[in-house]
Every structure is written in C-alpha cells, then in structure tokens.
Amino acid sequence: MESLSGRIVRSCAGRDKGNFLVVIRADESFVYVADGKERKLASLKKKSLKHVKPTNTVIDTESLTDKKLRKLIAEFSAASDF
C-alpha cells in the first residue's frame, strides 16, 4: 500500500460524501482524516479505504493547524475539477 499520509482525498461515501479531506494517518484498512471544520485535527474521522478516492496532491502535515487545513482544502477545491 502506498503512503497516504498527507494526501488530499475525496470522500465517496457517508455524510461527508463529495468533500475533500486530508489523511493524517493510515493503517492497513482505514485512514484517519480531518478537514479543519467538521472534523478537526483533535478528533479525526476514521474512514474505510474503500470510501475515499485519493488525489495526486500531498501536503506537509508536520506543522498543520485547523486554520491552515481549511485554507489548503479551500484552495485545492477551487482549483480542482476533480
């Protein structure tokens, strides 16, 4: 499995379907994502790998805050026709 940490993904199932999220960490069958608004870095959302579609964009999660995360996702969403 390729490393998904830091990758922007699109949710394909659930209440957040269609939203962009950032993978903070991953294991064999799940990813833990945040968007800085509904799901903050302090309370990550556990999603199945089957329910997310990865993009080619990877961001640095080292010094990430909820505010920076919201800004990065908004910029990506505006520039993307994904």
Enumerate the language-model features and the residues they cover.
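Short, charged beta-turn/beta-strand-edge "cap" motif at the junction between a beta-strand
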Residues: 14-17
